[in-house]
């Protein structure tokens, strides 16, 4: 393994918030103490955190290549182990407890971000993600004559809501379809699982404690919206889904159905060590995926912290650029591939009531609408203006809580 030992004096900056992760490394504290400081001020989110021996930091941005989410400062003379992102796989195979420690820290951070997002914007709460809604899902599938799927939803409703208001009706539906009240048992100790075409792997609103890796076949991810099935994605061999189950035992936000005969690897906290040892490439991909989730939540929170509607719209455009890791240079251009209405929806605005913001947005010299599609003629100008809006909002918030 190629790790470096780095020494930092008291007060030395290891990296700065919003800086590029160059080189792409993260750190483990061998001796000393490091403070993480986040400039973005949001109620419910820790602004400062002190880390000590054995703790790690900078994993998310090292693994994804996104800008740093906080500044890291050595508060005493410290010795750090610098780990290049491409050595991560080797590191976790030699220390599976470290991989699980990273997962646990991700869980805490995501929960913190999600709670803050919920507190700021009620529209971000997904009220449908509740086991009691399994009954409604079963009813919808029953009416569409998808009886196997309906039976699954009703069985899960009885399992998770044994004293629910619709228990009698759920049992009646199952009797009509000549289906058992209890679903077939799944051997949780078995990693490899086989699903026939059109078989449900899990459904929205169902509590989950496993993620899945597709070994063979393909899986359709969908969600029922206003009585209509919306396909969110079709995943193929090598893809990972249901990954939030390793972080938080919340109900599923979507349904997964085998698009063809499938062989999956089911991973939970109990067999995660085995995955790390036997399939380190998959474990690395999983932690990279979770790192993306954290970065996305961080940027969503930063966007919500901007008070000015135009600032939020511009920042949302910048997020799309950052997601694709497009270099921001003077006069560099970018085609966002989205309409003005799409952009309004992305920040939770109603397109029928907020057209004035789009009109104001297109007055910017570096923004244009080309056949309804938003384009940027100068990414550096976009980046600079978003920075101004962000600083302005932070000053206002800090004054309120001073």
Model-identified regions with their sequence ranges:
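Alpha-helix N-cap/N′ positions at the starts of helices
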Residues: 6-9, 83, 126-136, 193-196, ...
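Regulatory nucleotide-sensing modules
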Residues: 1-39, 175-228, 237
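Phosphate-/nucleic-acid-contacting segments
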Residues: 127-177, 309, 316, 322-402
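Short, structured interface segments
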Residues: 91, 96-119, 161-180, 283-294
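Short, Lys/Arg-enriched, Trp-marked, Pro/Gly-tolerant hinge/linker segments that flank
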Residues: 120-125, 297-309, 327-332
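TPR-adjacent "capping" and linker segments in tetratricopeptide-repeat scaffold/adaptor proteins
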Residues: 115-133, 184-187
């Amino acid at each position: 393994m190629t790790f470096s030992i780095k020494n930092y004096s008291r007060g030395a900056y290891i990296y700065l918030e919003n800086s590029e992760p160059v080189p792409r490394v993260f750190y483990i504290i061998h001796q000393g103490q490091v403070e993480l400081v986040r400039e973005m001020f949001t109620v419910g989110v820790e602004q400062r955190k002190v880390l000590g021996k054995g703790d790690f930091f900078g994993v998310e941005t090292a693994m994804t290549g996104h800008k740093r989410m906080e500044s890291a400062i050595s508060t005493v003379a410290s010795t750090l182990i610098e780990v290049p992102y491409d050595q991560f796989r080797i590191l976790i195979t030699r220390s599976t407890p470290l991989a699980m420690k990273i997962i646990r820290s991700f869980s805490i951070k995501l929960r913190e971000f999600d709670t803050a997002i919920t507190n700021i914007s009620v529209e971000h709460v997904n009220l449908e993600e509740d086991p009691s809604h399994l009954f409604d899902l079963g009813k919808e599938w029953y009416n569409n004559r998808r009886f196997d799927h309906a039976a699954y939803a009703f069985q899960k409703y009885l399992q998770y809501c044994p004293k629910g208001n619709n228990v009698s009706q759920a049992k009646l539906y199952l009797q009509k379809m000549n289906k058992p009240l209890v679903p077939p048992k799944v051997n949780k100790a078995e990693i490899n699982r086989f699903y026939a075409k059109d078989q449900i792997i899990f459904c929205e609103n169902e509590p989950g404690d496993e993620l899945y890796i597709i070994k063979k076949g393909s899986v359709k991810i969908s969600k029922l919206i206003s009585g209509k099935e919306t396909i969110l994605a079709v995943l193929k061999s090598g893809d990972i889904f249901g990954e939030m189950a390793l972080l938080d035992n919340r109900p599923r936000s979507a349904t997964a159905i085998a698009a063809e005969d499938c062989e999956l690897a089911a991973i939970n906290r109990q067999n995660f060590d085995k995955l790390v040892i036997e399939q380190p490439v998959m474990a690395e991909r999983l932690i990279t995926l979770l790192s993306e989730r954290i970065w996305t939540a961080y940027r969503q929170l930063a966007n919500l912290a901007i008070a000015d509607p135009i600032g939020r719209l511009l920042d949302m455009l910048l997020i799309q650029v950052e997601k694709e890791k497009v270099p921001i240079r003077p006069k560099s251009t970018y085609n966002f591939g989205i309409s003005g209405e799409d952009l309004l929806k992305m920040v939770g605005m109603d397109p029928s009531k907020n057209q004035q913001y789009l009109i104001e947005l297109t007055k910017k010299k570096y923004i244009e609408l080309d056949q309804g599609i938003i384009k940027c003629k100068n990414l550096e100008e976009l980046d600079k203006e978003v920075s101004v809006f962000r600083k302005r909002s932070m000053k206002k918030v800090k004054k309120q809580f001073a």
